[in-house]
A protein has these predicted regions:
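Conserved glycine-rich Rossmann-like NAD(P)H-binding loop of the short-chain dehydrogenase/reductase
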Residues: 23-37
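Conserved Rossmann-fold cofactor-binding substructure of NAD(P)-dependent oxidoreductases
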Residues: 43-60
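Catalytic loop of short-chain dehydrogenase/reductase
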Residues: 98-105
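N-terminal Rossmann NAD(P)H-binding glycine-rich loop of SDR-like oxidoreductase domains
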Residues: 9-18
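Conserved N-terminal Rossmann-fold NAD(P)-binding element of oxidoreductases
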Residues: 3-7
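A short, exposed helix-loop element centered on a Lys and neighboring polar residues
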Residues: 87-88
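Conserved NAD(P)H cofactor-binding loop of Rossmann-fold oxidoreductase domains
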Residues: 67-72, 103
Length: 105
């Protein structure tokens, strides 16, 4: 399957990406920080999910996992608006199997 995961540079997002890669899936990670995963089947997009104008055109995904999040004054823009933007751009199409939202505080 083709999987898109936001927030893959560390923590939960990185662990989820590693698990999908171990199972042989193709993973695209989006994060503000540079690539931290160096494995076959992984593609990294370094960008801020708040900037919808920079969302690249990508082939459809089977699974979209919204994991990126912050705990500061930008929380609404990242945790809510960024999640909505990613879901609208990549998670709404025929053939999508799942869209997951991860949140923590």
């Amino acid at each position: 399957m083709r999987v898109l995961i936001t927030g893959t540079s560390s923590g939960i997002g990185r662990e989820i990406a590693d698990k999908f890669l171990e199972e042989g899936h193709t993973v695209t990670g989006i994060d503000r920080r540079e690539e931290s995963i160096q494995k076959d089947g992984y593609t990294h997009i370094c960008m801020d999910i708040r900037d919808k104008a920079k969302y690249p055109e990508l082939e459809p995904f089977d699974i979209v996992i919204n994991n990126a999040g912050v705990q500061n004054e930008d929380d609404i823009d990242v945790n809510l608006k960024g999640t909505i933007g990613i879901t609208e751009k990549y998670g709404i199409h025929p053939g999508i199997k799942a869209v997951l939202m991860i949140g923590s505080a």
